[in-house]
């Protein structure tokens, strides 16, 4: 118990330092576009450090049973540009197939109540951990069908990215939200005075989005984030334990960030009535943006690391 307490204490100190750094920074998720960003970052990292793994993935990707949908998004692209774009579209693919036979809605999140009501709501909602474990096993199995491994690849790219978003790991229960706020989907806020009301969850999902074609967000963020946050600057990329244990740790990080930053500020006045949605403060906007940037680039690196573990690549 003392060892676990020590680990938790170190983790909270680490997260507090992150928030302190964000609070002193200037202001400069996830949507489909942000998932494309994590996919691009993962590709870049593998290209730099594990190019043989990318080659090993090519025949697996070629066997994807929904390849026609993916290829339709890559028209006119060739060579490296096409290979990188394929990673981007694979990362968002689970969102694109919602409502189809490939859909697993509960794999996108794994929520724990972080309010004082956690004592009466101790269980988890969502099965991201189960989805991660299942797809990791399939991708790691050389004897599995290539089509199944390709589907598992897309889900791993997506799930690992999803759970970096704090509100994919936490929700709030209270007298206002007796059955929870459904990870911020029932509470409305506004980014600026006079702005349109937006769900708190959507606020976080879309925080880095850029207007334009589907890859506009990836083009705006993928390379700048890697320059700002190279692996050496991210101590959270130090791993220990099984893939399952590492995934659990990533969920714990997001849970703590939801408590320390996500469910603060205007959320404390958020309302089910969109018309009465309060305005988030400039400080909240700045901190949430900085957190999103770091979590997105971390998610991209972790996707690459997950694939290395699954395919036993150095």
Name what the model sees in each region:
Residues 5-14:
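Bacterial N-terminal signal peptides that target proteins for export
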Residues 28-159, 166-314:
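N-terminal, motif-rich segments that launch catalysis or mediate targeting to/interaction with membranes
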Residues 24-26:
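N-terminal signal peptide c-region/cleavage motif recognized by signal peptidases
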Residues 14-22:
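Bacterial N-terminal signal peptides
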């Amino acid at each position: 118990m003392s060892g676990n307490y020590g680990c938790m204490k170190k983790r909270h100190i680490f997260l507090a330092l992150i928030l302190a750094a964000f609070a002193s920074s200037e202001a400069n998720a996830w949507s489909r576009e942000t998932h494309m960003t994590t996919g691009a970052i993962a590709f870049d990292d593998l290209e730099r450090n594990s190019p043989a793994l990318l080659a090993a993935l090519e025949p697996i990707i070629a066997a994807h049973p929904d390849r026609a949908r993916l290829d339709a998004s890559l028209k006119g692209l060739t060579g490296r540009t096409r290979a990188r774009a394929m990673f981007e579209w694979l990362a968002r693919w689970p969102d694109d197939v919602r409502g189809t036979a490939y859909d697993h809605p509960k794999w996108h999140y794994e929520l724990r109540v972080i309010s004082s009501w956690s004592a009466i709501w101790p269980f988890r909602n969502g099965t991201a951990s189960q989805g991660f474990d299942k797809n990791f096993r399939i991708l790691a199995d050389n004897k599995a069908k290539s089509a199944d491994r390709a589907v598992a690849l897309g889900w791993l790219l997506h799930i690992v990215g999803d759970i970096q978003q704090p509100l994919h790991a936490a929700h709030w229960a209270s007298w206002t939200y007796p059955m929870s706020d459904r990870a911020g989907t029932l509470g409305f806020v506004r980014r600026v005075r006079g702005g349109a009301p937006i769900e708190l969850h959507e606020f976080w999902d879309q925080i880095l989005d850029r207007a334009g074609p589907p890859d506009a967000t990836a083009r705006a963020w993928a390379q700048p984030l890697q320059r700002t946050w190279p692996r050496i600057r991210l101590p959270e990329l130090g791993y220990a334990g099984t893939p399952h244990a590492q995934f659990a740790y990533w969920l714990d990080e997001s849970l703590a960030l939801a408590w320390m930053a996500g469910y603060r500020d205007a959320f404390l006045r958020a309302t089910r009535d969109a018309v009465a949605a309060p305005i988030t403060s400039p400080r909240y906007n700045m901190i949430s943006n900085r957190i999103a940037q770091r979590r997105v680039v971390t998610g991209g690196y972790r996707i690459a690391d997950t694939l290395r573990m699954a395919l036993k690549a150095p």
